Structures are given as C-alpha cells and as structure tokens.
Amino acid sequence: MVSFVIRDAEEKRHRNGVNALQLDPVNGRLYSAGRDAIIRVWNSTQTSSQEPYIQSMEHHNDWVNDIVLCCGGRNLISASCDTTVKVWNAHKGFCMSTLRTHRDYVQALAYAKDREQVASAGLDKAIFLWDVNTLTALTASNNTVTTSSITGSKDSIYSLAMNPSGTIIVSGSTENTLRIWDPRTCNKIAKLKGHTENVKALVVSEDGTQVVSGSSDGKIKLWSIGQQRCIQTISVHSEGVWALLMTDNFSHVISGSRDKKIVMTELRNPTNSVLICEERAPVLSLCYNIDQTGIWATTWNSDVRCWKLNKTDKLSNYSYSSNSSINSGGGGDGTPVTNSASNATPASAGKGYEVACIKGGAAIKKYHVLNDKRFMLTKDSEQNVAIYDVLKVKKVEDLGKVDYEEEIKKRSQRVHVPNWFTVDLKTGMPTIVLGQDEVDCFAAWVSAEAGLPEHAESGSDPKVNYGSLLLQALLEYWKPPPPHHHLQGGVPDMENGCDGDIRGNEYFIVPKHTPIIFSEVGGRNVCRLLVKDAAGETESALLSETVPSWVTNVVIERTIPKFIKLPFYLLAHPSMLKQDRSKKERLIANEFIQCRKVCEHVLEKVLGADLPGGGGGSSTGGGGNSNSSQNNSQSDANSEGSQVPAEERIELLCNDVNNEDYGKNIHLNT
C-alpha cells in the first residue's frame, strides 16, 4: 500500500492525544509523544509570552505510544503502533536507526538507567531487551544488532517497568496479571494476580522490592515482589487508571485516570489523598516539571498542561474519594492562592490549578468524500469545517464553523466516479491510502474536462486516471537506476521514459513536504520519506527495493492503466411512436465517456442527422425502420439544427431520469 498525509509543512502543534512524556531536567526540554505520529520537543521553562515549541521528531507513521530518554538525555527511544522501535538523537531531532523486531503494535518501553538498557513490549506478547550503547552506535554499514527476548506472556502487553539497576522487569497485560522477570537471565520470578482488568501502568521501586500497578478496573495496587502478594489496594478513581508517577522516596503515588482526575495518595495510608486536578479528557501520561513543584499531564486532547502539585506533608489535611471535588478557594498546598503569592492560574471551579499550558491543534474527526472523488469535506474537534483536494494533496479552504451536513449537500454533484482511495483519520490528520486490493487506486478514469477543468485545453478532452497522476506526482523526484535492457546495437531503450528523465505528470505537482509511506497489506511500515527526499541517493536506493511493481509500472514505465468498459443498451423511448421500440442496440464504451458522446452517436448513427460543425450523417440509422416521412423530418432538422449541440437535440433517459438533470458533462457510469 501507498499512503500519504495531507498536512502543513511544519506542524508545531499536536493534532491528537498525547500518549507519553519525558523531561530532560538538565536543559528543561519536554518531549511529548503524539497520536499524530510526531514527537515534539518543548521548552518547559518558557514564560507565557514565549513560544515553547523547539522542534519535531518525525519518522513514525502511526501513534507513538511511549518514549524514554537515555544516555543523559542525548538519545531518545520511541515505540509506535507502526510496529517499530526507533533510536533518536534527542538534541538534533533525527532518527538514527529503526528496529523492526516486533510483529505488532509496540505499546510500552522500560529503562534501566544504571545499565543503559531498554526493554520494549507490545501486542505481539514479546519483550525485547536492548543495549542502548549498541543501538546508538548503529550505522548504515554497521546495522546488525542482537537482542535478548523474554517469553512467557500469554496476552498482549500494555505496560512495562524496570528499576534503575535492571534487576527486575515487570509487565502488565490483558491477562490482568503482573509478570516479573530477571532481565539478566530472562528467568521468570513471579506472576501476581489481583486485578480484574488490563494492567495499564506500572512503576518499580529503585531497589526492586516493590511495584505499583494501575488497572482498567480502577484500582491501584502496591505489591511486594519478595512476598509475591498485594499489600495495599487504593480505590480513588471511578474508572480505569492509565498513568502513574511516584515520589522519589516511593511514599506517594500520583495517578491519572480515565475519569479525567489526577490524584495524589499516600501508599501506606490511602486515606491521605488529594485531588490535584480534573482534566478535560481521560489522562494518558504524567511527568514532573523541572523543580517537581508541578506535574505535566496529557490526555486524549492535544493540549499538554502543567498542574500545581500538593506538598506531601500536607496530605493529612485531606481525605479524597472519587466523589470529592477540589475546594476552589485553596491552592494545591492547602493555602489560599492569590496572584501575588503564586504564578498558578486557577482553572474553572473545582478543576485544579493550572501552571502552564502548551496548546495543541484540532484533530479531524469526520470526513466526507464528495461524489467527484477528488474533494472531501472534514470536520475537526473544534467544529471547524474545511475542504481538501485529495488529488493535489492540499487543503483548499477553511470554511469555519458552518453546517457540515449542509455543506455536503451544497457541494455534492450528480456524478459518479469510482472509489479510488480510502481515508484514515487515526492520527488526527487526513491520511490517504492507495492500494490494489479492496479499493483499486486506478479505478477512477475521468475526462480532463470534467476531472481537471483548471488544466483542460479548449478543443481537446484527454482521459486521465486520478491514481496514476497522483502516484506520478508523489514520486516526481525519484530517479531510480536505469534499467539493464537495451535495443540492438547497444542503444539504451528510452521508450516510456525508462531513462528516468520523464517524471511527474503534465497537470500538477504536490507539496514537497508531503510524507509518503509504503507499507505491507497488513499495515506494517516498510518505508517513510518526504516527497522532496526521494531525490536523495540513499532514499532512491531504498525506494528501488520497496516500491511495488504496480506503482513503478505507472511512475517509471509509464504504463497506462486499463480502461474499464461498460456495456449498455440504447432503446427508443415510448414517445417515439414511429421508432421500432422492440429493437435494442447493445453498445460498449469506456465508463468515463461523457453522455454527450452518446447523444452524438444517437444523432448520427441512429437518426442519421448531421453533427454540429458539418459532420456528415449516416444514411442507415441504428434504428433501422425509418420511413420516408421520418427521413424528411430528419432532413429538416439537419438543415435547421446542425449547429445545435447533440446533447440539446437528444434527450437521454436512464431509469426515467433525464441526463439534463445531471449536467452536460455527465459520465456514462453516472
């Protein structure tokens, strides 16, 4: 499959939920892993008047589920639904290498700081251990890496944790259990049962003797690894617990939940708990700010917020339950907040105290492909409607907060063009998928006059294939090595542009910043690059290895996709009393032929009339039973109306619907 994303050249704002956070306390950089497939880097110490955005790290093509900073903040490891683990230069923001060991979504990472070891796990039930120093030393020539694997998990893994010394690794899964291994030997230590739903979050104590778990069952549990049992159950949430953060001494847990609430609780005395804040959406991840006076939180929404943190020695003043709410007159430490006493900004009553907010962008939630199969309307999470040109890979117009359904009705045409692409909104940006299986990307043949009116030349009406034109535009900068076939005499075969000099198409170009993704039918990512990067030597060689033949046929060999033929019958309407209504004329034509061509056929071949412009008529009409009076009337019509277009002289009906109702450029398939 080939897919591409319609987006801006630089996307400075998350366009969907944010799955994970990492803070570099040395330089104050905050890393956020987005469901829009982009990792962004922010200055977490910015003031409200400064732009927090630093850069984007782009190489994934699906949700980034987890990230870990390692090597003192020099490198970052990421895990994604595109089934890959990637190694990044965190400071410069480029991808150093890609690990393709997993066979399904990679959901979680764990990091042993003292050993510089990272573990990855996901829906394929596998856990792989990676030596970070080995990963960061990989090059184009030195690209072989060995890994240890931990087996035994019977279900998909959603959470993973290690202690800094790397003596314990814990996984949580849809088995509703915690499995514990020694990563040094890959031997199983224990299996802990107690949760009733998926285990979504884990934290291991520094000494490796305890682990805290959060589950979709809404419970937080403290486990003793030595005793292999649960020693505390905390119930402060009404829905699943998806994020956990521990204080340095492992005495208090900060939990984020599907119920949108973030709560701090003392592990040994759960009655000492306080509601830090209530977010706008279910909480996905948590991390401390640079001085640990607040916590950064992410949710299903695209904003990243920092909330004022309570002091642990004041927790005994509170007793929070899932039905409690914040006293809107007090700060996070139990004292009143005024503008002179704190920089924190009170949010709406009962919602907590927001210290900072990194604003996100809107995610596209709805789309409708118009009947012309070129344009589509979208509606985003802020209720804004926009129109996109899929063929030219760009947004055409922001329509604002208008009636979405009315815009669809207003812009729909009575025309039929076959489906030739599918749309995926998983990342919050429109991803267009071209393939050869369920939806054939070469199915849409149209006349240039109807499909590309802005490029059609007067007097000519060539037929164009949308999928072919788009693939040629997407790979315009790719110049693969020349083929090894030659004509007799040693002269290179230049036919069909095989020398690579003929690239792109004659009608349009697409934005150079457009990401193109080549993937297997099952969705596994094979190659990702920008349109402009296809000219690079490395990228060109990679494309030569990965681009499927059905793409190279139209892009390089310039093979024309086959026309789709449509059989149909012509039958005289009952109102034509003198016409032989029992006789049908069976015809076959390309499905994209315009119905005015059928009118011309009827006028010339069936009725024997002249075409506009002096074209001679046939003396034997397709009707076959014309009598002399009919011929006389046709002769009169010829002399008086030979300059009138055929579609104005012939009325075509299909299922009793007049073709005039659809416009003069209606196609036969419509």
UniProtKB/Swiss-Prot annotation:
Ranges of Low complexity composition bias in the record: 338-348, 626-635
Q: Which GO-annotated molecular functions does the record name?
A: ubiquitin binding
Q: Where is there biased composition of kind Gly residues?
A: 613-625
Function according to Swiss-Prot or TrEMBL: Regulatory component of the Usp12-46 deubiquitylase complex. activates deubiquitination by increasing the catalytic turnover without increasing the affinity of deubiquitinating enzymes for the substrate. The complex deubiquitylates the wg/wingless-signaling receptor arr/arrow, which stabilizes the receptor and increases its concentration at the cell surface; this enhances the sensitivity of cells to wg/wingless-signal stimulation.
An example of a Pfam family matching this protein is DUF3337
Signal peptide residues are none
Name of this chain's protein: WD repeat-containing protein 48 homolog
Specify whether Isomerase is a keyword of the entry.
Answer: no
Q: Does the keyword Repeat apply?
A: yes
Q: Name residues in a coiled coil.
A: none
User: From which source organism is this entry?
Assistant: Culex quinquefasciatus (Southern house mosquito)
Q: Name one GO biological process term.
A: double-strand break repair via homologous recombination
Q: Which InterPro entries match?
A: G-protein_beta_WD-40_rep (IPR020472), WD40/YVTN_repeat-like_dom_sf (IPR015943), WD40_repeat_CS (IPR019775), WD40_repeat_dom_sf (IPR036322), WD40_rpt (IPR001680), WDR48 (IPR051246), WDR48/Bun107 (IPR021772)
**Assembly behavior:** Catalytic component of the Usp12-46 deubiquitylase complex consisting of Usp12-46, Wdr20 and Uaf1; regulatory subunit that, together wtih Wdr20, stabilizes Usp12-46. The Usp12-46 deubiquitylase complex associates with arr/arrow; the interaction leads to deubiquitination and stabilization of arr/arrow.
